Amino acid sequence: MAGKSAEEEHPIKAYGWAVKDRTTGILSPFKFSRRATGDDDVRIKILYCGICHTDLASIKNEYEFLSYPLVPGMEIVGIATEVGKDVTKVKVGEKVALSAYLGCCGKCYSCVNELENYCPEVIIGYGTPYHDGTICYGGLSNETVANQSFVLRFPERLSPAGGAPLLSAGITSFSAMRNSGIDKPGLHVGVVGLGGLGHLAVKFAKAFGLKVTVISTTPSKKDDAINGLGADGFLLSRDDEQMKAAIGTLDAIIDTLAVVHPIAPLLDLLRSQGKFLLLGAPSQSLELPPIPLLSGGKSIIGSAAGNVKQTQEMLDFAAEHDITANVEIIPIEYINTAMERLDKGDVRYRFVVDIENTLTPPSEL
């Protein structure tokens, strides 16, 4: 007996923009299908989708494990349009969100300890196989289907466009600070890099009651850091005198840079037993000097986006403290130009695609 066809297995006709193969790096209209809404699933009409550096790296084929055609986008805000019979988390018509993760094994140490984001078999939002073996497609599309365990309730008081980047950049910085104890009022934290991730790290740090110093190689970012985002200080990392004067002044550093850069001068800024939170993911290895760590009892902590429970906590915290990303809302047709600008760092501070109003179905859907 023949097995079900792909169209029978995935009856929901969908459309979006995809990179068709590993060589082009160019996004274009794409037709595909989503699975039917299962008993524990939520069908979601996508309103907005944020664009992050992971999306850029993915379309540039920097991750060999991804499958193509690839529909990127892992910062999704939408509306629940259908729910399975066993869904209790959300109702039809409510605003919902999805972050980077769509599934996990549910059995390993990480999963049973609510650390499913670190599960060895974690299913990320696109380019990887789902439980049934079919490939996941991301948020640059008109709709999606997700298990309720990974669906988030999106607070009504948050802007859906400004809130979309919270699903990646926001939770990454929030989770790192919460899990490492860098969320206590009065602590002094340095934020390295003032991009999409860095500017949200500043906002959450200030909401926690921390003293914040932005560390950057770009002098022009001082005004935005202090007057725009409320940072308490600005440190130009290329200025040897400024760096020398700041030695031993920070309780923690949040490093958000996604490019290779020297770590040793930053470690010197930490007090004894200070914490260096590494959030950026450069494509090449960083040089790690052992002496500053050993002599000061300092530690380096890596952190990826948080688990589902913590991501919901982050969204609720953001709503309470009026935290959203500074965004440039774009139509889907602008996506390739936006990726080029993102590659050059030419955005303050996040691109968000208006899916609802600009994504139209390709012909012959």
UniProtKB/Swiss-Prot annotation:
Listed name of the protein: Dehydroprecondylocarpine acetate synthase
Q: Name one GO molecular function term.
A: metal ion binding
Record's keyword annotation contains Zinc:
yes
Protein's pathway: Alkaloid biosynthesis
What broad class describes the main subcellular location of this protein? cytoplasm
Q: Which family does it belong to?
A: Belongs to the zinc-containing alcohol dehydrogenase family.
Provide the reaction this enzyme catalyses: dihydroprecondylocarpine acetate + NADP(+) = precondylocarpine acetate + NADPH + H(+)
Function text: Component of the seco-iridoid and derivatives monoterpenoid indole alkaloids (MIAs, e.g. vinblastine, catharanthine, tabersonine, vincadifformine, vindoline, vincristine, quinine and strychnine) biosynthesis pathway. Catalyzes the non-canonical 1,4-reduction of an alpha,beta-unsaturated iminium moiety; by contrast with the classic alcohol dehydrogenase mechanism, this reaction does not require a catalytic zinc or proton relay. Converts precondylocarpine acetate to dihydroprecondylocarpine acetate, that is spontaneously converted into dehydrosecodine intermediate, precursor of angryline.
- Glycosylation sites (chain numbering): 142, 147
